[in-house]
Design a protein with these regions (language model features):
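A structural signal for short, well-ordered beta-strand segments
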Residues: 37, 83-87, 101, 115, ...
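Hydrophobic beta-strand-centered segment that forms part of the acyl-chain substrate-binding groove
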Residues: 64-98
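A conserved, well-ordered hydrophobic junction motif at loop->secondary-structure transitions
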Residues: 36, 41-60
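Non-catalytic linker/capping segments at the edges of enzyme domains
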Residues: 1-44, 148-155
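Short beta-strand micro-motifs enriched in acidic
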Residues: 28-30, 102-106
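Hydrophobic core residues within well-ordered beta-strands of beta-rich domains
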Residues: 33, 79-81, 97, 111, ...
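HotDog/MaoC-like acyl-thioester-processing domains
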Residues: 1-4, 92-93, 104-155
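Short solvent-exposed loop/turn micro-motifs enriched in small/polar/acidic residues
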Residues: 19-21, 96, 108-110
Length: 155
């Protein structure tokens, strides 16, 4: 069962509602501590004909794992330090994919998380693990002014 819709930003490539080139995904916090999103990639995001570009899959997982930190109660800005992916199946365009992110371990300085992209039949197509670190205090303080650009946007 879905618990809560997370906020979207204005210009983020993945969730920015005002980004004309963005994917405009919505993220939802689940009862099992995960964050999920769905996405059907149009042909413009293909690498090979009919196949989602691997860089788009990477961006989807990066964002979803990072958002799992918000689900876990981390109220600070974080950035990706390391992200590893395993591409297990061809990911087609034009079908609804499910993207899931979870926190594995959290500390004062950062967190590790895992993510996956599943095909419509539930088959695991891509899996990822990532290390995310807290922004240094000076950078974090300057980012606080950008919080008004994040809001919960209706579906």
């Amino acid at each position: 069962m879905t618990k809560r819709k997370q906020p979207n930003s204005q210009m983020c490539f993945i969730c920015g509602m005002q980004n004309p080139l963005g994917l405009k995904l919505f993220f939802y916090e689940q009862d099992d501590e995960s964050v999920t999103a769905t996405f059907a990639a149009p042909a413009e995001y293909q690498g090979y004909p009919g196949v989602l570009h691997g860089g788009i899959a990477c961006a989807l997982l990066d964002e979803t794992i990072g958002r799992a930190a918000l689900r876990a109660g981390r109220e600070q800005w974080m950035m990706t330090a390391k992200l590893e992916l395993r591409y297990l199946k061809v990911v087609p365009t034009g079908v609804t994919l499910t993207i899931v992110g979870r926190v594995e371990k959290s500390s004062r300085r950062g967190m590790t998380g895992r993510g996956e992209i599943r095909l419509p039949d539930g088959t695991l197509a891509v899996e990822a693990s990532g290390l995310y670190v807290a922004l240094p205090p000076g950078q974090r303080d300057s980012m606080q002014a950008l919080l008004p650009m994040w809001q919960v946007v209706p579906d």
